[in-house]
Amino acid sequence: MADLLRDDIGLTGTKIGCSIGVCGACSILVDGTLMSGCLLPAIMVDGRSVTTIEGIAPSESELSPLQDAFIKKGGFQCGICTSGQIIAATALLAQNAKPTREEIKEWMMGNLCRCTGYYKIIDSIEAAAGIDRANV
């Protein structure tokens, strides 16, 4: 699915990192469920709703709360993992609007990042969820 999205449809926000479903760079939502795009045959999404990083913002001139929080909190550096991180976090917040820090860590374990050390990613997710740890 990731190759189809990138090469045939031109949605290049979905990255291909490991091609074995381990890194999370290819994360997409299928009917709202988080999936690894690199492992998913395109035929399996026929007739289903597929959301990539390009589809989570309310409009082309606005960012989603997660995209905005990642920018404000510095939740990315090189950017290879960013779309997968944001898609995974979108799925998390759809299921759990106010996750604990431990719940965020557990949920995001399938998304690898070699740059940030994860703290700023977690801070970004908390900010998007409206969680202020200084007051918790």
How would you label these PLM feature ranges?
Residues 2-136:
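Signature of N-terminal electron-transfer/Fe-S-associated modules in redox systems
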